[in-house]
Amino acid sequence: METSGGSPRKRHVLIVDDNAELAWFFSEILKLHGYEATVMADAVVALKHLLSHATDAVICDLQMPSLDGDLFFATVERARPELVRRFIFVTGLAEDVRFHKFISTVEAPVLRKPVAVETLLAEVDRAAR
């Protein structure tokens, strides 16, 4: 990927998680590995961002106050279907029936919190290709 000036464009990751500390940690790890990262705690605000910004990967919490990850995904799927394959879900939930059903219907990886750095980087590399 190149910018109009010919230099390589950094891949951009959108992190949607209401856990500010974890989202910041993910962001710092990604920046150390050459990514640009945007953190958004509110999924509704993140939806607006996705409509007008290029994104190479989306890390999304499954359970959030304003809009849960499954509904966020469904909205993105309708508005920007090309991003569906770029999702990575994270969750601290053990087994929630609603989310389990959703997870079984999508082809996005689900990482359990706490997430190993190596696992996070591998999944972001895969999603951002």
Question: Which residues make up each language-model segment?
Answer:
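Active-site residues of response regulator receiver
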Residues: 61
